[in-house]
């Protein structure tokens, strides 16, 4: 099990393959990703590496974190993420991870925080069909309808799909293909859409499930 990387979502574009077909891709940028700390079985009870990405001003960094970064001899980072790894895949503190950490054609799992949509109704949030446009409908065109029975069960079931806050949740999209990488510019091009807004932090890992054949 290898470490993943921390990236920033730049946006979407398209590239063309050898057959002239266009492929929609999301551009992810690696911004000075370095190993800040290690976790070992002897000391911590598990094996992991802590990565830092981006750059943070010293005045905006807490005193405790300043000491943490100084011990690793790295500049203060804007984002810290820990990745579980197998003991043979531990990376030295201070090492820099680049875009060639991934190879073209491999599958990755991408984690991000979806764009918040605020308070949304059941039709937008859960794709409900809504009520009838006319013929007996009284101000219930977009209502979610009944939420439960009468005496039994006498309550609303947990998990009942209703109106509420939509988006702003942590989502992992699995088995996205790496179309290409650019080590010089620190770019990874991933096929398809990735959760999150432009500029948001994204976590990219090796895929844990093989794609369905």
Swiss-Prot record:
Methylated by PrmB. Pfam families: Ribosomal_L3. GO terms for molecular function: rRNA binding; structural constituent of ribosome. One of its GO terms (cellular component) is cytosolic large ribosomal subunit. Keywords: Methylation, Ribonucleoprotein, Ribosomal protein, RNA-binding, rRNA-binding. One of the primary rRNA binding proteins, it binds directly near the 3'-end of the 23S rRNA, where it nucleates assembly of the 50S subunit. Part of the 50S ribosomal subunit. Forms a cluster with proteins L14 and L19. Belongs to the universal ribosomal protein uL3 family. This is Large ribosomal subunit protein uL3. It comes from Agrobacterium fabrum (strain C58 / ATCC 33970). The gene is rplC.
């Amino acid at each position: 099990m290898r470490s993943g990387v921390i990236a920033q979502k730049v946006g979407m574009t398209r590239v063309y393959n050898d057959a002239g077909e266009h492929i929609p891709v999301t551009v992810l940028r690696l911004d000075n990703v370095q190993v800040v700390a290690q976790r070992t079985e002897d000391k911590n009870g598990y094996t992991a590496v802590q990565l830092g990405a981006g750059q943070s001003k010293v005045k905006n960094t807490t005193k405790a974190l300043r000491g943490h970064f100084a011990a690793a001899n790295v500049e203060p980072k804007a984002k810290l993420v820990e990745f579980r790894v197998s003991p043979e895949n531990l990376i030295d503190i201070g090492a820099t991870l680049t875009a060639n950490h991934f190879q073209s054609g491999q599958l990755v799992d991408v984690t991000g925080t979806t764009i918040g949509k605020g308070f949304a109704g059941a039709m937008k949030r859960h794709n409900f069909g809504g009520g009838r446009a006319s013929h007996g409908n009284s101000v219930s065109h977009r209502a979610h309808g009944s939420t439960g029975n009468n005496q039994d069960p006498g309550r609303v079931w947990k998990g009942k799909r209703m109106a509420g806050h939509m988006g702003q949740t942590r989502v992992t999209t699995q088995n996205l293909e790496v179309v290409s990488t650019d080590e010089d510019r620190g770019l990874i091009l991933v096929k398809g859409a990735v959760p999150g807004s432009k500029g948001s932090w994204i976590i990219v890992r090796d895929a844990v499930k093989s794609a369905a054949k």
